[in-house]
Each structure stands twice: as structure tokens, then as C-alpha cells.
């Protein structure tokens, strides 16, 4: 067993960013085994405007971790600081949330070299990765044709109209 602290609340980027939580590690690690933090993947809103205040649940990039809560370096420092004190960090990931860079379905390809391993990590996306019953399938272009001809399997979970429903059966 153990005790987990929710290290954020809605729109708490200033009060609970990575630097603030790192500075509180001496105190918090005395009482908590885990600190729960929001998704750290870079949202498209932050990519376009670094003053964006996204909570991170609209990630566009999964392999880049700069957000309104801080930079990837600040995140790594926070994790290392708590780990050294025996406290873990757990990230709140909504695996079915994926946002496009500038529209519904333009998911950028990602290519990142691991800092510790030197290994290349790559992600690429297509319309086949989006469930065929996602609401984007109902969007029409100016000629009345399906704007996003998505071809993934039917959604296996709850539908959420805010972001694309990803086909996890094709992984």
C-alpha cells in the first residue's frame, strides 16, 4: 500500500508546474509514495503558442514533453528528485486522446533519439489509426465528400468528441 497525492488540479499550471513540484519534494516525499501529474505530451496549442494553458489532455506529440507545466528537462528533474527521495511520479495518460497539429487529423510524425539509450523512437500516423466511427468521419469537404476517410476498426471504448478516437486493435 501507499498514499498517492494528486499533484495538480484543473488550470493549475502556475501552482503545480514541474518546478513548483520539484521545490516541494522535501516536504511531499515525507508523506506520499506517489505524485500523480497530468499528461506531459506536447499539445498542439503549446506547440503553436508556448503561453498556452492546456492541461495536456489534448496531446499532439507523444514523444516530446514540453507543455504548460514545464519543459522536458524540468519534468526529468522532477522525476529524478522524487525518485531519489523514494517517491514515484505517475502520469495521467488518456491513451485515446490524440489531437492534430492544425486540424482534426493531421498527426505529425515523430522521431526522437533517446537521451539515455541513443535509440531512435519513431511514431507515424495515418487515417487507418482512427476509428471508423469517430465523429471526424462525418465531416465533409467543400464537395460533399468525406473529409477524413478514416478506416480503423470501430471504437472499443466510450466516444469522446473532443479528440480522435484511436484504433487500439491495430497496434
Walk through the language-model features, giving the residues of each:
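Substrate-binding/active-site clefts of carbohydrate-active enzymes
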Residues: 3-26, 30-171
